[in-house]
Swiss-Prot record:
It comes from the Eukaryota. GO terms for molecular function: serine-type endopeptidase inhibitor activity. The lineage of its organism: Eukaryota, Metazoa, Ecdysozoa, Arthropoda, Chelicerata. It comes from Tachypleus tridentatus. SMART domains: SERPIN (SM00093). The keyword Signal applies. Residues 1-22 form the signal peptide. One of its GO terms (biological process) is negative regulation of serine-type endopeptidase activity. Specifically expressed in hemocytes (at protein level). Belongs to the serpin family. This is Intracellular coagulation inhibitor 3. InterPro entries: Serpin_CS, Serpin_dom, Serpin_fam, Serpin_sf, Serpin_sf_1, Serpin_sf_2. Transmembrane segments: none annotated. One of its GO terms (cellular component) is extracellular space.
Amino acid sequence: MKTLIFTLSSLQLIFLPQLSLGNYLLDEILHLSDVDQQQLSAVTRITNASNYFGFDLYNTLKGSGNVLISPYSLSCAMAMVYLGSRGVTEREMHSVLNYGSFGLTRDDVRLGFQQAINTLTSNTIGYTLDTANALLIQRSFEVQEDFRQKIETDFGAEVREVDFQSQTTIVQQAINTWTAHKTQNNIQNILKEPPDSNTLLFFLNAVYFKGFWETTFDPKQSTIMKFYNNGSVSTDTVMMMMESRLPFGYVESLNCLALEMPYQGRNVTMLLLLPVSPNGLPELEQALSPASISLIYSTLRKRRVKVFIPKFKLEEEYEEVLKEGLSDMGMKSLFGFNANLNGITEDTGLYVTTVVHKTSIEVDEEGTVASAASGVGGGWRSATPRFMANHPFLFFIRHSETGAVLFMGRVSQL
């Protein structure tokens, strides 16, 4: 028996101020005063667990080249599986997903994601955020009714019986049509190929984000400049330029420049981290943690800064390397015959064979996703500091009210 988990995070950003990444701030907690305290505690802890899981996973995937993952998207898909896990499989997932570190029970996970999903998809002034959750089951496969109800109620997911064995093309078309509908046609052809005919469970989480910058780039200012791939080999790229008052700072302990780029509505922000040294990204990655992000925000001060960000598009897909990474992190039994998913079905022999995570980002004068830079010929000490994204940098896109990191990644080569 096979189980396929598929998470797609599709991101297109359009370039339009000032939020924080990391733990909740007091005003953010007060802003959620209409939420039951138990639910508030759960959503706070579930987003923290998701963010820490994202950092842990990033460290297993970073290798070389570009990286782009959605901690929220993948955590959401894995949480649906977790709710159906039992025994050793449950304990392993509980640990790897950082639920234990934040004292999250099974009910906390349900309540946390339920509230996070509701908050993420409401009050989206100035940006678009569409999510889609689904669980497709082989028709001959009986799902526990209690599990079905929790997935539908808490994750807003649709649970459907399909025939993977003889109607894979029809299933592919149905998934693509459904996802396009749920994301207002922003995500199309999510499956390029039909699912494996041996698939019994198909978990899908899709996220689409499109944000407008509060302060826009002028396309007339864009020019061809050098970007140093992997910190050394130069290539010509279109560099967008602007001068504006933005949260900016130098983080001495990390030897990097930090810039915060807000979107309209002030509920989503991008944090860019640029090593001062063109070859300093490995050291920055090694020193960085969710806790250090809070330190970074404490160093930011709103000031006039010259910003240079490359225009680019990233598309990444993780399959075997993701499965290996999760296994190395301690999620071992889930991917073998010893998996215990009795919360999904009473049948034995069900395990996960494939985990797929697809992400995409597009950056242009109207939108952004990843940009960072360190000034060659300029820096944080000048009268008007420069943030010159002409060598590898990191970025984080985060929803302030829930604290969820929607996307995080690295631009290493263009």
